[in-house]
Amino acid sequence: MKIRHRLAGVGLMVSILGCTFPAWAGEWIQGENGQWVYEENQELLKGWNRIDGIWYCLDTETGVWIEKPSMTSEAACRLLENKLLEMGMYRDEEEPLQFKVDYENTQMIQVSVGYEDKPDVFHRINTYEIDKRKGTADPVVGEKEFSLR
C-alpha cells in the first residue's frame, strides 16, 4: 500500500514537472551598435509599450528604443503620464487616469488628465500645454513648466 502511494506521488510530480513550460520574462538587450531593444517571449516589442509601468517608444520596424521620440499627440500623452508618475502626482485617484488630447496645432498639444466614473463622463483634474519643439509641459493649474524628455 505504501509503495502505491509513493508511486502515485512520484507519478504526480513527474506529470506536473513534465507539463511545465519555461516562462520568458522580458529583458532589455543592448546590441553591438549600443542601441537598446526589448525582447519578450523571444520577440522584439515595437511601437509604444508599457514596460514595468513606464511607457517606452520602440521603433515600429526595428524595435530600437527611441529615447526622444517626435512629439506627436500619442507621445505627448505617454511622456506626460511617465513624468507625472515620476513626480508622484495623481497616485491616490480612485479611478484609472486617462489622458485626452483636447487640441493640437503646429506648436503645441493640449492634454487633459482626468478619469471617467461613468461612460462618457470625463472629470478633468488638470490640463497641460505641451510645447512640441521644447518637449515641455505647462500645467494650467499648478507648478511651472517641466520637461517631458
Residue map of PLM features:
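Extracellular adhesion/carbohydrate-binding repeat motifs centered on closely spaced tryptophans
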Residues: 2-74
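A short local loop/turn or secondary-structure capping micro-motif enriched for an aromatic residue
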Residues: 65-67, 118-120, 146-149
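Short, solvent-exposed secondary-structure boundary motifs
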Residues: 36-42, 49, 85-94, 117-121
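Short, non-transmembrane alpha-helical segments in secretory-pathway proteins
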Residues: 68-100
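Exposed beta-strand-loop-beta-strand "reactive/processing" segments of non-cytosolic proteins
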Residues: 92-132
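Solvent-exposed, acidic/flexible segments
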Residues: 51, 69-77, 104-106, 121-123
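A short, surface-exposed interaction/processing loop segment used at functional sites
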Residues: 124-149
